[in-house]
Amino acid sequence: MSRSMSRRPVVASLALAPMLGAGAAHAEGSVGIVETRKFVTRDFKLQGGAVLPEMTIAYETYGKLAPDGRNAVLLTHGFTSSHHMAGRTTANGAEGSWDGLVGPGKAIDTDRLYVVSSNMLGSSYGSTSPASKNPATGKPYGPDFPDISLVDIVNAQKALLDSLGVKHLVAVAGPSFGGYQTFQWGVTHPDFMDGLVAVVSAPKGSGGEAAVKSLIDQLAKDPNWNGGWYYDKGGIQTVLTDMRVATLKRYGIDEQLAAKFPDKAAREAEIRKRAESWSTVFDGNSLVALRKASVRFDAEKDMAKMKAKVLYVLSRTDKLFPPSIAPDVMAKLKAAGVTADYFEIDSDFGHSASGLDAAKWAPRLKTFMAGAEKRS
């Protein structure tokens, strides 16, 4: 395993909101008010050989870990989204992206399962990333942030789980880039889980280095880019907002907002508002670091290492990972000796279907999770 920790890891807690008291009521099926915590470890060795002197991983948890440490589920998130996947961070805050799937009595049942939702290494929601302070300079890593891989992201999560006392996972589950992580878990730590739920995703990245160059070229259109050293020059929010608008439209946001905003101009204004909010948080260099990791990702070549059962889920209207790729992926899983099932979400919400149309695939997920629990 490509990590080295010369000093004892530290688990820190950063509360974003007070937790519900033991006697406080919450909506049926909800995990209630949640908080982000932070795990910190030292001297984390990356697959490429570089060492992060200090690494932080932000995460949320839902449910309670069993004494034997074997009732856990790991949730993995998408490329530009966060680890907030269930409950709310404040009473009036937004629900987590998989709130319809995670909670008491839901498909991923927190009455029985301990769920860990990890912000991936390199992301902009609390984990170590290019915007983090480089101990050597006291300034953000920026473009000097070392290349990371899906193996590094998974091994960082494994270090987190070890610190929490998790001995075995019932399943790993996640959408999009989270599906990449799910497949990578299956080949990097094949004995550590009983189920893999890869959603609107694939076992191999696409686009190649040309996709990385294209991304950098887009970011460089902002006059503050400065080769990626924009932190003291006002940032690159303008170009990030424009890019986010385009991304949201690829994800199917027009269809999502059509009922609430039937007027096209009002809908466009809402999309831009959401894009502007995102661009105040997400770092351009994180986009580059994660894009590099994604185009180099390839769990397909190591599929024969997988031991867990796979549930592969796509969305009927997804333009990023269309259902047309399913036969090839399923054939390769079968050829590698992997037991796998396929499910297609009949949704108009494209790449966002797994959360927005949770009810349309929750029964299938619940059945799969019940089987994985029995195997655990």
List the predicted regions and their residue ranges.
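Catalytic-loop region of hydrolases
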Residues: 27-75, 79, 83-89, 376
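Short beta-strand/loop motif that positions the catalytic acidic residue
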Residues: 306, 312-314
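Conserved alpha/beta-hydrolase "acid-adjacent" motif
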Residues: 319-325
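Alpha/beta-hydrolase-fold enzymes
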Residues: 192-277
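N-terminal cap/lid subdomain of alpha/beta-hydrolase-fold enzymes
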Residues: 60-134
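Catalytic active-site module of serine/aspartate enzymes centered on a nucleophile-bearing elbow/loop
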Residues: 336-376
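Conserved acidic catalytic loop of the alpha/beta-hydrolase fold
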Residues: 139-144, 151-170
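Conserved hydrolase catalytic core segment
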Residues: 168-207
